[in-house]
């Protein structure tokens, strides 16, 4: 987040995935990535239906969790291809309506603009200075706020020099 609010730099995403649950990872859609997490066979059947591939839920290679893990090299590219057909917002709506756990995968810019980030007051505007990432802790539901910006070059020179013995 620091890089984004300081100069607009958005870090690269890295692939994700569970070695014991398939699918349980991020995928690209027509526009932005999504994380799918149908963590059991019932949720997988719902996910397959939303993807328009009901037959995956009964296919002997994919019907049960252990089989999906064993055949993930075949299954994951098919899921990836299906998800490219629609934008993220549409998939999120369809998956959520069906009860399939899923979430948007935000880049740093999207994250910095979320309601949750604003509500957490994690990004703080310093008086007369830049926006910074605040402390990631709170006390009694209050996040400590930085009282001021760093001093400008030479701001305290006279004060410091005046305090030195002559």
Question: For the regions a protein language model found, what residue spans apply to each?
Answer:
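Substrate-binding/catalytic subdomain of NAD(P)-dependent oxidoreductase enzymes
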Residues: 1-15
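Short solvent-exposed loop/turn micro-motifs enriched in small/polar/acidic residues
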Residues: 17-20
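Flexible, small-/acidic-enriched active-site or ligand-binding loops
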Residues: 63, 126-166
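Conserved PLP cofactor-binding pocket of PLP-dependent enzymes
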Residues: 96-117
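Short low-complexity, flexible loop/linker segments enriched in glycine and/or proline
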Residues: 117-123
């Amino acid at each position: 987040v620091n890089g984004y609010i300081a100069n607009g730099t958005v870090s690269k995403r890295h692939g994700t995935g569970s070695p014991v649950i398939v699918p349980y990872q991020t995928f690209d859609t027509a526009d932005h990535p999504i994380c799918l997490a149908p963590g059991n066979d019932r949720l997988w059947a719902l996910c397959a239906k939303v993807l328009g591939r009901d037959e995956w839920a009964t296919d002997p290679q994919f019907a049960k969790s252990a089989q999906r893990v064993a055949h993930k090299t075949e299954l994951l590219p098919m899921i990836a291809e299906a998800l490219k057909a629609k934008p993220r917002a549409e998939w999120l709506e369809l998956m959520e309506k069906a009860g399939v756990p899923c979430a948007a995968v935000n880049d740093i810019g999207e994250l910095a603009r979320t309601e949750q980030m604003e509500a957490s007051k994690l990004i703080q505007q310093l008086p007369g200075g830049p926006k910074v990432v605040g402390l990631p802790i709170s006390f009694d539901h209050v996040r400590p706020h930085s009282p001021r910006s760093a001093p400008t070059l030479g701001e305290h020179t006279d004060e410091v020099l005046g305090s030195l013995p002559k």
